[in-house]
Curated annotation (Swiss-Prot):
The keyword Zinc does not apply. The keyword Acyltransferase does not apply. Its EC number is 1.11.1.6. Heme binds at residue 371. This is Catalase X. Residues 1-59, 511-547 are annotated as: Disordered.
Length: 547
């Protein structure tokens, strides 16, 4: 009886406190648009600091100024180590309730897919990868395509890219990959020789480089580019049976890409063009849409294939594993505040709901730790309490404390004295399991070893042959322009790799390099004219007298 009375008293007190803090009042001579400081104090003079006389020294008790400037000093959180430059929008995913002509429940019990016409709120963040927060959106770079779906079972994050494959398959190489693509730690200049030094010694990257240096490496904007989950995931049905699955987002606006020359011309006019394009389209009611497709494959090793189906450097070809529609993604609302929503939006490949699961893709499993870890560093331990990241459903947890906690995620009626589980004193209880667990059988020796079926060049050659002649020409031009800045050993290794992919591919790169005089310019990706540009700025600039 004592415990019941105590719990009711705490609930009453908590309710009273919440009501008191949620009720906002305005003081005398205040209206809704009255400027205040963060303490709620009205600001009567926002133009002048407090001084001894109007020309005298400032006083230390300038609280409004000290609060204002101190907050300004801390306005920026650490930018993302990759995908720093981004844009985002709100919208929804609408399910078709089927996988092609079959009920989707045959393959997955995830609730958001089951009912035709069911809409799930979504937030999508697009990005470039290797450059800083305010870098141009015209650079040759993969584009991030990260989707957060606020489902009835909690959040699901699908953290993908526009290109359907990746450079590497082992997460141990990821920091080195990023270091190679990002600026030189001494000069702070992106260096094509550093990039191809790494790529030439990582033959599994040949396929991705083939896409990146073609027009597919510079999407025209975010609305007219594809999205992909890149990795093989799993769908799990009510019986606990699983299939491998890949996700694809195809823009209903069509797909458009840029050549290097076109991108440079656009960059000279507006280096925020993709962000502006997305924002303006939504403001004008021209809501971008993507048809969402899935491919499935039985959850086994597939020895009949010449590649490992879990290898993220490989495509699953449509002819073998058809794309089937499962829904559509629509973006219909711009963010109200960029920092609060787009910058603080936090995604993780480990954020899955019931009916979805991981595959044994090594890179996927490495990302699953890295993404959530970087959000805790970048945004804080309580990043999931921010509105953009918080699920749109009941949350109750015994996690507490940490930097910037501003609420306790407690269940209604929970005994506030019990912040652990199990308990018989009014604490939280475990949920009931929906469907059967998926229990894959795994056995083997623990070792450091690459997968058996690497086939690093087969699909790179197939992609080269499937390109149009225009795409092949642009690919060769861009590769030659950057490789011409590299030492001969790197050029020779890349020619060897391209030749293994397709003899014509290697031959054309070799012929192109013969026509370009070798130089040691540390040029950025896709151009050999960077040193000339630096000299041009000095030679063609206009002198001015000091003042």
């Amino acid at each position: 009886m004592k415990d019941d009375h105590q719990n009711k008293q705490h609930q009453s007190n908590a309710q009273g406190s919440e009501e008191a803090f949620s009720h906002k009042t305005s003081g005398k001579n205040e209206s809704e648009d009255t400027l205040t400081n963060r303490q709620g104090h009205p600001v009567t003079d926002n133009q002048n600091v407090r001084t001894v006389g109007n020309r005298g020294p400032t006083t230390l008790e300038n609280y409004d100024f000290l609060e204002k400037i101190s907050h300004f000093d801390r306005e920026r959180i650490p930018e993302r180590v990759v995908h720093a430059r981004g844009a985002g929008a709100h919208g929804y995913f609408e399910a078709y309730g089927s996988f092609g002509d079959e009920p989707i429940s045959t393959y997955t019990r995830a609730k958001l897919f089951q009912e035709k016409g069911k809409k799930t709120p979504a937030f999508v963040r697009f990005s470039t990868v290797n450059h800083g927060k305010h870098s141009p959106e015209t650079l040759r770079d993969p584009r991030g395509f990260a989707v957060k779906l606020y489902t009835e079972d909690g959040n699901w994050d699908l953290v993908g890219n526009n290109l359907k494959i990746f450079f590497i398959r082992d997460p141990l190489k990821f920091p080195d990959l990023v270091h190679a693509f990002q600026p030189d730690p001494v000069t702070n200049i992106q260096d094509g020789e550093r990039i191809f030094d790494f790529i030439s010694q990582s033959p599994e990257a040949t396929h991705m480089i083939t896409f990146l240096f073609s027009p597919w490496g510079i999407p025209a904007n975010y609305r007219q580019m594809q999205g992909s989950g890149v990795h093989a995931y799993k769908w799990v049905n009510e019986e606990g049976k699983a299939v491998l699955v890949k996700y694809h987002f195809e823009p209903k606006q069509g797909i458009r890409n840029l050549t290097q020359k076109e991108a440079e011309e656009i960059q000279g006019k507006n280096f925020n063009h993709a962000t502006q394009d997305l924002y303006d389209a939504i403001e004008n009611g021209d809501y971008p849409e993507w048809e969402v497709y899935a491919q499935i494959m039985s959850d086994d090793e597939h020895p009949e294939l010449d590649f490992d189906p879990l290898d993220p450097t490989k495509l699953w070809y449509k002819d073998d594993f058809p794309w089937k529609p499962i829904g559509k993604l629509v973006l219909n609302k711009n963010p109200e505040n960029y920092h609060a929503e787009v910058e603080q939006a936090s995604f993780g490949t480990g954020v899955l709901v019931d009916g979805l699961d991981f595959s044994d893709d090594k890179l996927l499993q490495g990302r699953t730790f890295a993404y959530s870890d970087t959000q805790r560093y970048r945004v804080g331990a309580n990043y999931l309490q921010l509105p953009i990241n918080s699920p749109k459903k009941h949350v109750a947890t015994n996690q507490e404390g940490g930097q910037m906690q501003y609420r306790v995620d407690r269940a209604e009626g929970q005994n506030p004295h019990v912040n652990y589980e199990p308990s018989i004193m009014g604490g939280l209880k475990e949920a009931k399991q929906d469907g059967k667990d998926h229990t894959p059988h795994v056995e083997g020796d623990v070792k450091r070893e690459a997968i058996d079926r690497t086939n690093n060049f087969g699909q790179a050659g197939e992609t080269y042959r499937r390109f149009t002649e225009f795409e092949r020409n642009e690919l060769i031009t861009n590769l030659v322009n950057t490789l011409s800045t590299c030492r001969k050993e790197i050029q020779d290794q890349m020619i060897e790799n391209f030749t293994k992919a397709d003899p014509d591919y290697g031959k054309r790169v070799a012929e192109g390099l013969k026509k370009v005089s070798e130089n040691n310019s540390n040029g950025p990706i896709g151009t050999t004219e960077t040193e000339q540009a630096a000299k041009q700025a000095e030679q063609e600039s206009h002198p001015s007298d000091p003042y």
